[in-house]
Amino acid sequence: MKIVQNTVLKMNGLYKIYFTGEYDWTAKESPFLYLTCELPPPPLFRDEHYNNIIPQVSLFTILNKFNGETEKEYKTYKDNLIRKFELTKLPPYIILYIKRFTKNTFFLEKNPTIVNFPVKGIDFGDFLAEDAKEKHKDVNTSYDLIANVVHEGLPTSGIYKVHVLHKGKSQKPTSLTLKKN
């Protein structure tokens, strides 16, 4: 994965964000075990019927982070960084981690956003860098879902369940419950 970043300068106590053409980007190659996808923040208000709104987002929407064009701001203890991510090589298996839990000053929150994704034929070819597309031209860039791990319950408690596609059992997913120690 190629990570391109720039430091946001702090001037007079305020952060100055430059436009894309006004500053230098630094790029580095970084191997990855999984891709971290961030969910959009949940809505603050209820709908007109006073029901909680559970937003839905497509998998391809949260994967746009890796298209090499989308800029994301990250804060560290000493700097603010703007980063862009681009895939340079596709592994045999891709693990997607959807960041659902956030911790603020007071407590841990769980984002209830539903992620809609296809089970078969997820194409990662669009997220490859231009030079990597040439290398993967004759290679299949589509992936099928093999397993899914979900958390059920409150952020501080609950259980994790894994759904595994077992080809020997007529392609039906098997559900397993993982106990928390």
What do the PLM-derived regions correspond to, one by one?
Residues 1, 11, 33-35:
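Detector for methionine-enriched segments
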